[in-house]
Regions:
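Canonical BTB/POZ domain core
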Residues: 9-120
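Peripheral membrane interaction modules
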Residues: 1-7
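Terminal low-complexity, poorly structured segments
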Residues: 6, 29, 75, 111, ...
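BTB/POZ-protein C-terminal extensions
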Residues: 24, 56, 80-84, 88-97, ...
Length: 198
């Protein structure tokens, strides 16, 4: 976005966000800064829009911690994914959705990178399902490969019990059957090589 602070077309004053079903508050966020950092808000608070003069904006379909991290990113250019592997992966997923919805491509890329780095035995299956739902082929392939290569650890972490999506379950079963077929073919080649050896 080419606008800069001081541009007369930018709105003045703060906005309060009412977040989630409980309408928890994030107060005193500069509309001007939001418009400069995010094209979505530039349009929302643009000339002729009813939100331009609104003191409060409701954001019902997210949680306070994730939306606070999103607003903090817009205001400071710093990404906070929280503490702990599971929380970081969950927050990265939610922030990525917020970045897509609000058209913030750099944040979307940072979240995609964080997701790729957060694949562990405990997160592989939930991330696999999320990648399937979002249509993220790269993360999907990475998670499938991880589950195949670390099956024992994923199973021990409870990853299999977390599986909810039948399509993903079918894909994992297909991967397992492919691995069994490869093992059998390898064993057959080894046996044939032994028989052919003098």
């Amino acid at each position: 976005m080419k606008k800069m602070p001081g541009d007369a077309s930018l709105p003045h004053g703060p906005v309060t966000f009412l977040v989630g079903k409980e309408e928890q508050r994030i107060e005193h966020v500069s509309k001007n800064l939001l418009c400069v950092r995010c094209e979505y808000y530039g349009k929302m608070f643009g000339i002729g829009m009813k939100e331009r003069d609104a003191a409060e904006i409701t954001v019902p379909k997210t949680d306070l911690a994730s939306f606070t991290a999103f607003i903090d990113y817009l205001c400071t250019d710093q990404l906070d994914l929280g503490e702990g592997e599971g929380e970081q992966a969950r927050r990265a997923l939610v922030l990525r959705e917020l970045a897509q919805m609000h058209q913030v491509p750099r944040l979307e890329l940072l979240c995609a990178q964080a997701l790729q780095e957060s694949v562990t035995p405990a997160t592989a299956v939930p991330l696999l399902e999320a990648a399937h739902t979002m249509g993220d082929g790269r993360l999907l392939a990475q998670c499938r490969r991880y589950v195949a290569d670390h099956a024992v650890e994923v199973r021990a972490s409870g990853g299999v019990e977390q599986l909810r999506d039948l399509g993903v379950a079918k894909g994992l079963l297909g991967d397992a059957l492919d691995q069994v077929a490869e093992l059998k073919m390898g064993a057959a080649r080894t046996a044939a090589g032994r028989r052919a050896a003098p």
